[in-house]
Amino acid sequence: MTLWINGDWITGQGERRRKTNPVSAEILWQGNDANAAQVAEACQAARAAFPCWARQPFAARQAIVEKFAALLEAHKADLTEVIARETGKPRWEAATEVTAMINKIAISIKAYHARTGAQKSELVDGAATLRHRPHGVLAVFGPYNFPGHLPNGHIVPALLAGNTLIFKPSELTPWTGETVIKLWERAGLPAGVLNLVQGGRETGQALSSLDDLDGLLFTGSASTGYQLHRQLSGQPEKILALEMGGNNPLIIEDVANIDAAVHLTLQSAFITAGQRCTCARRLLVKQGAQGDAFLARLVDIAGRLQPGRWDDDPQPFIGGLISAQAAQHVMEAWRQREALGGRTLLAPRKVKEGTSLLTPGIIELTGVADVPDEEVFGPLLNVWRYAHFDEAIRLANNTRFGLSCGLVSTDRAQFEQLLLEARAGIVNWNKPLTGAASTAPFGGVGASGNHRPSAWYAADYCAWPMASLESPELTLPATLSPGLDFSRREAV
């Protein structure tokens, strides 16, 4: 029984599915997808639970969310292992994901009060009050790269605001989704407030096409995000929050500390085996001797990275990709760029056929035409050389995406120029592109999505503002508008 609908664990009636470890092929999870009728049942349960949940005092909703945080802390080691085994990422990195889930809860509570709480302004004859109200029933689509942390960034603020939810994890991480939902169950969520439906494309389409949804919160690929946007077009009454990744540039100016610049680049491009939406995909390196030295050192150090199993000792910097198919896709993207005229600086290599272990790849594309503007979700870094900083900014902005952008430079004036001209939601200076603060907005522009999911601004799209002019007394104004006559007329 792998679906949780209206407080009950039930068996899916759809396609049979199993999840294996992407490195060892060990079977981790088996179950059936939710069919369309079960998806509709989950929505009905959420709709029935909404009025009571929305009317709960905020303190009551907060108490359940904080109980969930305590359960995450108590079961941190177990959830870390589930995430690591299911995604292929090393244990150390999976542990940081669970820590981020815990920390995000306190931040979400603060954000609710700061961004969507009640505010009152006294007027001469009353008051103006701003309140916020939940949308109703929301669907949450989770990604596979952070299967606990990123859905958590939608689910927690949505529940705090008083919404009820249907959660569909990625079909590549059903085990993590189920494990997290079991902790929510133990936290004491009322039946129907949060429902779990497992499945792939058919389940997702059944969920996103429900007429009774009030909104959809999505983290994933641009292609799926665009599909959801088209599907919900002409329905302005539904909130749609999309985080769709990026084709992110990292600009490397001449710097004295080459090793520090290389370390920052490795953290930006190859952490999580390149499976972070903020990962650097395009490395823009200044022409000249220092740029040459930087690239040579980068190729040297990146070539030493050996991906390993989640539980290897010592721990590797990177583990496997989410699947062998994902690793193959990266290899195909590299070969495509070679065919276009790219010069390979470091060839990616499958550590073992049939697994998702893949070493990093680096390819120079300076002067190469028709390079696809796409997010290759893996450890493949594309390099361009530039002559001057204005050209670097032009190259950085030459994408339909706009998630993250970074600069490695000791020149503050260059960073100030980048802040003015970059088209990206996150612009970092001498910090990895993959570094983001949960107390700051997270998200981008263009094909990278809308709103700012999974962080401080998530409260904004989980509730709508209600403005009120209020007075406890009903009075006739001392001064009336022109043309109004309230004088008493004597009877004839």
UniProtKB/Swiss-Prot annotation:
- Report the EC code(s) recorded for this entry: 1.2.1.71
User: InterPro entries annotated for this entry?
Assistant: Ald_DH/histidinol_DH, Ald_DH_C, Ald_DH_CS_CYS, Ald_DH_CS_GLU, Ald_DH_N, Aldehyde_DH_dom, SuccinylGlu_semiald_DH_AstD
**SUPFAM superfamilies assigned to the protein according to its UniProt record, in alphabetical order:** ALDH-like
Give me the residues that bind NAD(+), please. 220-225
Which keywords belong to this entry? Answer: Arginine metabolism, NAD, Oxidoreductase
Coiled-coil ranges per UniProt: none
Active site (record annotation) = 243, 277
> Which residues, if any, are the signal sequence?
none
Q: Which leading EC class covers this enzyme?
A: oxidoreductase
Molecular-function GO terms, alphabetical? succinylglutamate-semialdehyde dehydrogenase activity
Q: Which reaction does it catalyse?
A: N-succinyl-L-glutamate 5-semialdehyde + NAD(+) + H2O = N-succinyl-L-glutamate + NADH + 2 H(+)
Q: Which terms under GO biological process does the entry name?
A: arginine catabolic process to glutamate; arginine catabolic process to succinate
Keyword Cell inner membrane listed? The answer is no
* Role this protein plays: Catalyzes the NAD-dependent reduction of succinylglutamate semialdehyde into succinylglutamate.
The entry's family comment says: Belongs to the aldehyde dehydrogenase family. AstD subfamily.
The identity of this protein, by name, is N-succinylglutamate 5-semialdehyde dehydrogenase
Q: What is the lineage of its organism?
A: Bacteria, Pseudomonadati, Pseudomonadota, Gammaproteobacteria, Enterobacterales
What is the name of the gene encoding this protein? astD
